[in-house]
């Protein structure tokens, strides 16, 4: 077991009840283009086209053969594009239940599948896009070979769903999906299942080729970047792949039913949610519809993902992300507080222990307010308190801010994704957002070396 001591469990109100309910019915779903790093789409559909579930919507020009499929049957009502015609979303109005069928196998056959059989089914169904690489967090090329594959079956993000609750509903499908993953490279590459040390994820009998790694401690103990760092670190010439446990369930169902499984069980939670809980919805769900009559009055920000690293869901991207397993809702913090800096702050939380709210175990109604403007970095040890990886965070963040990619690479930036620096952003006295800085550095390194 690996114990994480440095980090932070954010004391945020609105913790979800770990019981699954049916969410609001949604009649719109979307595939979001900006989730896929470096992807350039070659569109296979137009507005007004009727599509089946599992039908190809677009293909990646930079990664030929990697296709992105429809999460539901219906009509393509809108293809949203942003600046420089960057694809934002392909929106489908859900109608009917027609779907493309794929090759199915008996459960007893899964352990003897060839790598080609596994790969073909994953690519054709669009489930190849469930994989992401480290470094760079991109959908892997079809001819790429990783050092290992990581399955993340734990989640320490604020307000997250407990994977154990979800996996109890899909125990057989999860095991089938893990078996399929072991066959992707004919059993030649290790598959690591990372779980909470206290969770009781059923894996009996043991699956050949699956190595279980247990983690405990504070966030970011549940991030895949933490798992990779301690188990099989990456570098400029070494790549690993990872995916989440609900995509493993989808893979298991694909191979045993021949159908694309797009159900999602997510956490709908946060200070502005009336009844925080786990809800059953579908991949790409319209979040305005999903959260209708679920939120407290006022101006709210709906986030696809964690409050620390998720994306604002509004306008053309008002949909559940491909990799999101939670929807978080905060009040927009537009109110100004007179002399807030001098008040004792019994209703505020700070990692520096400079306010009264630090004392006693209480939950806080966090808002989107950052309480100050962007300014210079202040190295007071805050980054080191929340960074459990074997890197020097202050120096790395300085190099990212300065655009020094050579030094940043030497300090370990290739191991990281935006979510790995989310706590550094949260505790930064200078109110700097280090996620975009990291992404800019990774893009430059990939392009120029």
UniProtKB/Swiss-Prot annotation:
Enzyme Commission number: 7.2.1.1
GO biological process: sodium ion transport
Record's signal peptide: none
The keyword Glycosyltransferase is assigned to this record: no
InterPro entries xrefs: NqrA, NQRA_2nd, NqrA_C_domain, NQRA_N
Keyword entries, A-Z: Ion transport, NAD, Sodium, Sodium transport, Translocase, Transport, Ubiquinone
GO terms assigned for molecular function: oxidoreductase activity, acting on NAD(P)H, quinone or similar compound as acceptor
Domain of life: Bacteria
Catalytic function, reaction form: a ubiquinone + n Na(+)(in) + NADH + H(+) = a ubiquinol + n Na(+)(out) + NAD(+)
Function: NQR complex catalyzes the reduction of ubiquinone-1 to ubiquinol by two successive reactions, coupled with the transport of Na(+) ions from the cytoplasm to the periplasm. NqrA to NqrE are probably involved in the second step, the conversion of ubisemiquinone to ubiquinol.
Family, similarity comment: Belongs to the NqrA family.
HAMAP family the UniProt entry points to: NqrA (MF_00425)
Assembly and interaction partners: Composed of six subunits; NqrA, NqrB, NqrC, NqrD, NqrE and NqrF.
UniProt protein name: Na(+)-translocating NADH-quinone reductase subunit A
């Amino acid at each position: 077991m690996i114990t994480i001591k440095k980090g932070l469990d954010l004391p945020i109100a609105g913790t979800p009840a770990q019981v699954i309910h049916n969410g609001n019915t949604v009649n719109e779903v979307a595939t979001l283009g900006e989730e896929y790093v470096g992807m350039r789409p070659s569109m296979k559909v137009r507005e007004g086209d009727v599509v089946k579930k599992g039908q190809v919507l677009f293909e990646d020009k930079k990664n030929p053969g990697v296709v992105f499929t429809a999460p539901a049957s219906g009509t393509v009502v809108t293809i949203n594009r942003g600046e420089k015609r960057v694809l934002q979303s392909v929106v489908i109005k859900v109608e009917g239940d027609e779907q493309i069928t794929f090759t199915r196998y008996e459960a007893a056959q899964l352990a003897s599948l060839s790598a080609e059989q596994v790969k073909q089914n994953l690519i054709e169904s669009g489930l190849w896009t469930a994989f992401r690489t480290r470094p760079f967090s991109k959908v892997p090329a079809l001819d790429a070979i990783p050092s290992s594959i990581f399955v993340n079956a734990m989640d320490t993000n604020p307000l997250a769903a407990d994977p154990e609750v979800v996996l109890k509903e899909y125990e057989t499908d999860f095991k089938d999906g893990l078996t399929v993953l072991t066959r992707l490279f004919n059993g030649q590459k290790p598959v690591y299942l990372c779980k909470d040390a206290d969770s009781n994820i059923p894996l009996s009998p043991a699956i050949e080729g699956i190595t279980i790694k247990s983690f405990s401690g504070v966030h970011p103990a549940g991030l895949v970047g933490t798992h990779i760092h301690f188990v099989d670190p990456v570098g400029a010439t070494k790549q690993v792949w990872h995916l989440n446990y609900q995509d493993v369930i989808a893979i298991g169902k694909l191979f045993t039913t021949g159908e694309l499984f797009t159900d999602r069980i997510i956490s709908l939670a946060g200070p502005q949610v009336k009844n925080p809980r786990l809800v059953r919805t579908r991949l790409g769900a319209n979040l305005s519809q999903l959260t209708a009559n679920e939120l407290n009055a006022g101006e709210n920000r709906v986030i696809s993902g964690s409050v620390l690293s998720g994306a604002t869901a509004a306008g053309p991207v008002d949909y559940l992300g491909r990799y999101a397993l939670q929807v978080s809702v905060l009040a927009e913090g537009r109110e100004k507080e007179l002399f807030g800096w001098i008040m004792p702050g019994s209703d505020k939380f700070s990692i520096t222990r400079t306010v009264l709210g630090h004392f006693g175990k209480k939950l806080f109604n966090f808002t989107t307010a950052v309480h100050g403007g962007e300014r210079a970095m202040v190295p007071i040890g805050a980054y080191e308190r929340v960074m459990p990886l074997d890197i020097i965070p202050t120096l790395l963040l300085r190099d990212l801010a300065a655009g020094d990619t050579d030094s940043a690479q030497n300090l370990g930036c290739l191991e990281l994704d935006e979510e790995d620096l989310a706590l550094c952003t949260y505790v930064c006295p200078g109110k700097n957002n280090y996620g975009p800085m990291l992404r800019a550095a990774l893009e430059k390194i990939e392009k120029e070396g």
